[in-house]
């Protein structure tokens, strides 16, 4: 039992990751239901029964949840959570021997937790139920055919915490691209992830600590920040510093 939170800004592959996480659960041995907005495009997951609400028919997300609970599901999932009342009821279900998986728009794993606290989830309840908060971003990969080597300037080395001897060259996008990447200088995308979980984090969630303290607690539990994961891809030539700056200046959705 417990609560799993998935988050990202818009257009960061969140729907795909949500499907993967839910599909990885042992749904053949458990009954899962999803709470879905009837106005949204259907996106069904095998062996997960959708229960839909429709504001045009005066049914609310909580109405759909109550209907779903009549089936005594072991798991409940919902995407792009925005309804405060539904959020509270879902966390209560996570506290009552059910696995709850939700997704919402947030810039990182800690912001997702603070958003739940901010909409009125009792801190001790959230701390008791939180299994983990997983955040992701999608970054474009440099085209392997036309990417260029360059000597990073001192300010970039300082940002990467490297010396010139440790990092004599980096990769960047080719100026004109090539036929392989259709002139874009990038080819394909990859995801970077950040997982906030652990006893230290839950201890400070219960205290409703500020985001900086929560991030420090999560780091002690082993969380590697998204930016750190992104810089790892810069160092190994998978992507460029310019791409990381583009990704991390994008605003999170609300």
Tell where the protein language model's regions lie, with residue ranges.
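Short, flexible helix-loop junctions that flank or precede catalytic/ligand sites
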Residues: 1-254
């Amino acid at each position: 039992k417990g609560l799993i939170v998935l988050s990202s800004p818009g257009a960061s592959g969140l729907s795909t990751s949500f499907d993967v996480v839910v599909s990885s659960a042992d749904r053949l041995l458990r009954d899962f239901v999803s709470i879905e907005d009837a106005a949204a495009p259907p996106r069904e997951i095998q062996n997960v029964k959708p229960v839909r609400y429709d504001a045009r028919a005066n049914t609310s997300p909580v109405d759909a949840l109550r209907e779903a609970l009549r089936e005594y599901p072991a798991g409940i999932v919902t995407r792009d959570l925005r309804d405060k009342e539904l959020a509270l009821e879902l966390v209560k279900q996570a506290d009552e021997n059910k696995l709850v998986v939700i997704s919402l728009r947030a810039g990182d794993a800690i912001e997702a937790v603070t958003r739940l606290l901010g909409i009125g989830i009792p801190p001790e309840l959230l701390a008791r139920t939180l299994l983990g908060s997983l955040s992701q971003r999608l970054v474009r990969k440099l085209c392997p055919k036309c990417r260029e080597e360059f000597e990073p300037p001192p300010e970039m080395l300082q940002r990467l915490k490297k010396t010139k001897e440790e990092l004599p060259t980096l990769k960047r996008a080719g100026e004109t691209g090539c036929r392989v990447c259709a002139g874009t200088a990038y080819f394909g995308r990859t995801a970077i992830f950040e997982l906030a979980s652990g006893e230290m984090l839950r201890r400070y969630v219960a205290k409703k600590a500020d985001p900086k303290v929560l991030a420090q607690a999560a780091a002690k539990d082993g969380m590697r920040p998204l930016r750190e994961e992104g810089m790892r891809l810069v160092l190994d030539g998978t992507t460029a510093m310019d791409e990381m700056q583009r990704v991390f200046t994008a605003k999170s959705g609300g």
